[in-house]
């Protein structure tokens, strides 16, 4: 997709930039020719990841490059911990559950025969959903609390490790085996069914995807 953008337009996709400040000029929002939104972003000089949006910047401050972007529109697709949603002060409406799930992108070593297909596995230990991705990666959504009841507490979630996700997947998928030759990314979260109380601000800043709604993966039990 990115290569097609380069061939067919002047659009360039940039990575590893972290927003740190955003302002909107209310006097210009109704002017279709204006660029009323100012976003300040930071990146490291060597192009490495300057830090996760919900964690302190881990790069040295003297290695950070600052940039100011003037935009007509901003689209926030930055996930459940959306920086843009938080910056706008938009809140979620709905309920959290006591169900804790893990998600991981791994290169699996498994005896499960349909690993390169979208699959949903139910057992007495819980639910696992697998979705094939690029470069031999597979994304796994894993119901952790069914195997580890203590995972429902916030403190326990912070203590979880990728090995805990693998242990839960193994228990649910038994007698199939499961190992990770490589782990590209993982996370754990308490699921809920919530939606943002606002999707757009001044028809200039928009929220989409996980930044605007949460849903419980347990609905797959009913499908």
From Swiss-Prot:
Gene3D superfamilies: D-Amino Acid Oxidase, subunit A, domain 2, FAD/NAD(P)-binding domain. InterPro entries: FAD-bd (IPR002938), FAD/NAD-bd_sf (IPR036188), RIFMO-like (IPR050641). Induction: Expression is down-regulated by ralstonins, lipopeptides produced by the plant pathogenic bacteria Ralstonia solanacearum. Expression is positively regulated by the imizoquins cluster-specific transcription regulator imqK. Pathway: Secondary metabolite biosynthesis. The keyword Flavoprotein applies. One of its GO terms (molecular function) is oxidoreductase activity, acting on paired donors, with incorporation or reduction of molecular oxygen, NAD(P)H as one donor, and incorporation of one atom of oxygen. FAD binds at residues 139-141, 189, 210. PANTHER family: PHENOL 2-MONOOXYGENASE FSQG, TRK SYSTEM POTASSIUM UPTAKE PROTEIN. This is FAD-dependent monooxygenase imqC. The lineage of its organism: Eukaryota, Fungi, Dikarya, Ascomycota, Pezizomycotina. The gene is imqC.
